[in-house]
């Protein structure tokens, strides 16, 4: 997907796995917090940031020492990953600056003429991107809000906070996740107030 056009950024790649067990080969440590979240929300719209193992190339992690991993809820996506025999590192199937697609027709509209084929698994269960939570540090931090809310995460983990960059858009802070600093998720609609 990164080859579709210059609109997609390498730092926006998430590693998608078919099974929870696949994560063990990719990350340094899966602590109790990660196990609780994986058991509660996977497969589903939760991306977890871990300290990566050396097997994860810098071009996948954007040069960071962490990697963002999710297990999609869509069975067709998980079957495709399983058939590939390896996790798949890819961004959302959208053009940067546009919302991520939630229906097959959104992908067809955005990607028409840019890709050779589109595998349709059906519409998404949620209308927003996955929540991204960073577990690479002692305090769990939400890097990108999504359909799994701060409150839902707090019920499982106890203390969870929002990353300071979500509260203060400092251009000198390196983004840890897609959509934290850049123009992102902008619908093409006229709005009247």
Predicted feature descriptions by range:
Residues 1-5:
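Extracellular interaction modules
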Residues 6-193:
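Active-site-adjacent structural elements in enzyme catalytic cores
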């Amino acid at each position: 997907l990164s080859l579709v056009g210059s609109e997609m950024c390498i730092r926006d790649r998430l590693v998608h796995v078919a099974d929870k067990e696949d994560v063990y080969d990719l990350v340094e440590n899966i602590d109790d917090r990660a196990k609780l979240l994986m058991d509660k929300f996977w497969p589903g719209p939760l991306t977890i940031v871990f300290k990566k193992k050396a097997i994860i190339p810098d071009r996948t992690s954007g040069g960071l020492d962490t990697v963002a991993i999710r297990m999609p809820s869509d069975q067709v996506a998980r079957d495709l990953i399983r058939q590939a025999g390896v996790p798949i590192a890819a961004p959302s199937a959208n053009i940067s600056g546009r919302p991520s697609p939630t229906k097959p027709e959104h992908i067809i509209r955005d990607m028409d003429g840019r890709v050779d084929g589109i595998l349709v698994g059906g519409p998404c269960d949620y209308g927003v991107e996955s929540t991204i939570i960073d577990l690479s540090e002692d305090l769990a931090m939400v890097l990108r809000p999504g359909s799994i809310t701060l409150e839902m995460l707090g019920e499982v983990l106890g203390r969870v906070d929002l990353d300071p960059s979500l509260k203060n858009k400092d251009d000198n802070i390196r983004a840890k996740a897609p959509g934290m600093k850049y123009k992102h998720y902008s619908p093409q609609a006229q709005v009247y107030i």
